Structure formats: C-alpha cells, structure tokens
From Swiss-Prot:
This is Pathogenicity locus probable regulatory protein HrpS. It comes from Pseudomonas savastanoi pv. phaseolicola. Signal peptide: none annotated. CDD domains: AAA (cd00009). GO terms for biological process: phosphorelay signal transduction system; regulation of DNA-templated transcription; symbiont-mediated perturbation of host programmed cell death. The keyword Transcription applies. Keywords: Activator, ATP-binding, DNA-binding, Hypersensitive response elicitation, Nucleotide-binding, Transcription, Transcription regulation, Two-component regulatory system.
Length: 302
C-alpha cells in the first residue's frame, strides 16, 4: 500500500487540531489510535503524519485490509514459518512484525474478517505474536493506527466487527469530518490546491469565477478532500470541472459583485438542503433574520 509522503501542516492541523500534541502523546503512552472518516478525508495522510511526529525509529507499515484476500490475510498480517501450509515454501515476515520499532497502519479495518479480528486483538493486548506455523513468541514494539470508512458502532451492532476489538481500538478516536459539512473550507482549500498544482506543473494558476464557485459550493464532494484536490488540478490544466468549462464566456466574467452573489446563493442552498428546507433552522445557522432570508431566496431565485 502506497502512502503520499507530502504533508500540509496547516491542512493537517485543520483536520486534527493539536495534531503534534496528539502524536507525541500516542508515542509516549503507547496507545492505539482509530481514525474514522469517509473516503478522501485524509486518514492516510494523518496516519503518516502521526508516525512522523511521534519520532519512532522504525518505519510506517501500511496494510489495506480490504485489498488482501481472506485466504491470505492471516499469513500476510502475522507472517509464516515454512512449511506452515501447502505453498508456503519459505518463511516470511508479516505486516505486524515488519513494523517492529515503528508504526503499523491498518487501513479499512472495518473490512477485516471476523476470524482475523480475534487474533489481532490478542496481539494488541499482549504486544506479542506467533508466526503462522510457529510456537515461538515474538515480542513487539509497535504503535498501531487503524482507520475505518464506515461506523464501527454500526458494524458491532450488525455483528460484523468484534465489540472487544472495537473497545481496544477506541481509546483514542480521531474523527475526520466530510467536506460537505464544512462548506466554508471548500473555496479556500480549492484555491490552495490550485496554487500547489500550478507550482507542481510549472504553469500559471487560474481564476475561479462566480459560476464555478457556485458549483463548487453546491457539490456534495463524496470523494472529499481527495476529490477537491483533483478538481483543482484539472482546473489549473484548463479542463472542465464539474461541468464548468474554464474557457466559457460566463466563466470569464468574474466581477466582485457577481462572485459575492454566487457565494451567497450557494451557502443558502446548502443550508436549506442540510435542514430539509426548514427556514427557521437555516436562518439560525446563517445568522440571518427569517424575513431577510425569505427575501434573499426570492431575489437569488433559489
């Protein structure tokens, strides 16, 4: 599993306030961490950031639990001593042992088979393992970070995830919120990613017209920050973003008044959508009197 090595200190701190303190505490106390969030919210980056800040001498070893077939998962995780089973022609180290002195990152742990969860729990509790086919115990010095895309609470209730393993991992949970719940971050992040993409590609950055702003703010962003970053790169390259052509006349008309109008319209639309068109709730969130909100809805043709 490949992890992006690029860090953005400001962005990481926005996603997890006091990240440096959290990482140092994890290293000193030897506790395991659970990262919870939808795809694209930055779990992989935060895991690598925690490892880097922690100062552990070993490396970060990442295993995507959803990408390994169930038949191979046990030997991949715990290692194997030849000949533990047919086809095991040589001994090899598993993911856990490879992280000795460093950090083990179990991505999408909500996809781990139940049969493997019990064995992982034992390793987490004893900080020791036995390779498949061996009775020798290997003591471990490993920090464990796990991530889940779906709610482990729900998985436990559905019988898909062990309750005891969940409690073991849930000592410290870092929740990474989806982008759609933070509309105020969309435009600043888009512009930040545009600047980074322009520098990487050695091209000029691009303008963000009112139409594109409205589209960006109205999009659900199911891929979260990862999707937003890709959209910013496409825009810098001159490709359409969410159906908006950067070469269109409407896109090139970027007056301040029209930009503010587009932003206001998008923010009101998003608030109404979040609150199922409840004017009272939207008025409270937007800090706008009900009468003013009704008037702006009419004027902006929402």
């Amino acid at each position: 599993m490949h992890l992006d090595e690029g860090f953005d200190d400001d962005l990481d701190e926005e996603r997890v306030p006091n990240l440096g303190i959290v990482a140092e505490s994890i290293s000193q106390l030897g506790i395991d961490v659970l990262l919870s969030g939808e795809t694209g919210t930055g779990k992989d980056t935060i895991a690598q950031r925690i490892h880097t800040i922690s100062g552990r001498k070993g490396r970060l070893v990442a295993m995507n639990c959803a990408a390994i077939p169930e038949s191979l998962a046990e030997s991949e995780l715990f290692g194997v001593v030849s000949p533990a089973y047919t086809g095991a022609d040589r001994s090899r180290v598993g993911y856990i042992e490879a992280a000795q002195g460093g950090t083990l990152y179990l991505d999408e742990i909500d996809s781990m088979p139940l049969s493997l969860q019990a064995k992982l729990l034992r390793v987490l509790e004893t900080r020791a393992l036995e390779r498949l086919g061996s009775t020798s115990t290997i003591k471990l010095d490993v920090c464990v970070i796990a991530s889940a895309q779906s709610s482990l609470d729900d998985a436990v209730e559905q019988g898909k995830f062990r309750r005891d393993l969940y409690f073991r991992l849930n000592v410290l949970t870092l929740q990474l919120p989806p982008l759609r719940t933070q509309p105020e971050r969309i435009l600043p992040l888009f512009k930040r990613f545009m600047a980074a993409a322009a520098k990487e590609l050695n091209v000029a950055s691009a303008d963000v017209c009112p139409l594109l702003q409205q589209v960006l703010l109205g999009h659900e962003w199911p891929g979260n920050i990862r999707e937003l970053k890709a959209a910013a790169k496409r825009h810098v390259l001159g490709f359409p973003v969410l159906g908006v052509d950067p070469q269109s006349e409407e896109h090139l008309a970027c007056g301040l008044k029209s930009q503010l109008r587009a932003i206001e319209k998008a923010l009101i639309q998003q608030s109404l959508k979040r609150h199922r068109n409840c004017i009272d709730a939207a008025s409270l969130e937007l800090d706008m009197p009900r009468r003013t909100l009704y008037r702006r809805i009419k004027e902006l043709q929402i």
